[in-house]
Amino acid sequence: VTNNEELYYIYAEENELSALDVTHCPKLIWLSANGNKLESIDLTACSDLYNLNLSENLLSSIDLSVCNDLGPCRLSNNNLEEIIMPSEGVAPTTTLDVKNNKLTISTLPEKTLGMSSASRLTYAPQAPYVLPKDITAGTVVDLSSELKAFGVSDKEETTTYTWRLKTSGTALQKDVDYTEKDGVFTFTGTELADSVYCVMATAAYPKFTGTANMFKTTNVHITVPAGVDENTVSSRIITTGNGLIKVLNAENNDMIEVFSLNGALVTTRKVSENMETIKVVPGSYIVKIGNKRCSVIVP
């Protein structure tokens, strides 16, 4: 649509459009082009735009920075990973629908100053936060970008993270199956019956709730470092302060091996007494006795 400087309205819904040029439409106030195949669109000439509907396209990002008069704005069912919001922070004032995209807690738009209530922002569900399909125990999983957000709240909110088994939904145990600090996770290498995923919940975006609308990661398979068996001997191992690991009911000539979570061998010990005590630097380890193992956190 070129050389139409007096054009006010465009209705182009449900076509096969892969491109739409509105850079020469400075007076455009109404653009309805939902249900097309647009991968990008330049709206930087459309500062008078009031009504925008680009839902059900293939957009991965959109720049609304000059669209400070927006009322209703519909961008659902795209591939959006980034939205540059109107620069004055007031618009859209009527509705903003961004559900069914690839936005995260950290990239979702906040409730604007012009919205009369949080219900005018529709954001759930979103596509899962993508993680690698396989992660080795000891590898850091960094979700700290999602830890803090304002969203529709009047204050900054903190995200709650819950790791669950894929099929059963059973929650994993913090400081047993994984350690966490400020949204950064390390899996300890405990035996897990299934792949896992992380559910992220926050009062910043309270509609991320329930099976259909929860915000979660993709499924991840946690692998144990090579040379460490899947069996467990946790009932025979205790830890105390000062970096001590104690192995109970050990049999003579059993080989005890202590690994870091990334699979590096820390120390070995051949059992000579019923109880063996091993000194290590406080931290998380995998202890292997014969062909059995368990993870421990040593204070």
Where are these regions (language model features)?
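Leucine-rich repeat
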Residues: N3-L7, T23-L28, T44-Y50, V66-G71, ...
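Conserved LRR concave beta-strand detector
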Residues: Y8-Y11, A19, I29-S32, S40, ...
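C-terminal outer-membrane/trafficking sorting elements
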Residues: Y11-E13, S32, D229-P299
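Consensus "Asn ladder" position of solenoid repeat domains
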Residues: N15, N36, L54-N57, L75-N78, ...
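Canonical leucine-rich repeat
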Residues: L20-V22, I41-L43, I62-L64, I83-M85, ...
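Leucine-rich solenoid repeat scaffolds
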Residues: N68-A137
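Solvent-exposed loop segments of extracellular immunoglobulin-like
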Residues: F150-T167
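Surface-exposed, flexible coil segments in extracellular/virion-facing regions
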Residues: T167-T186
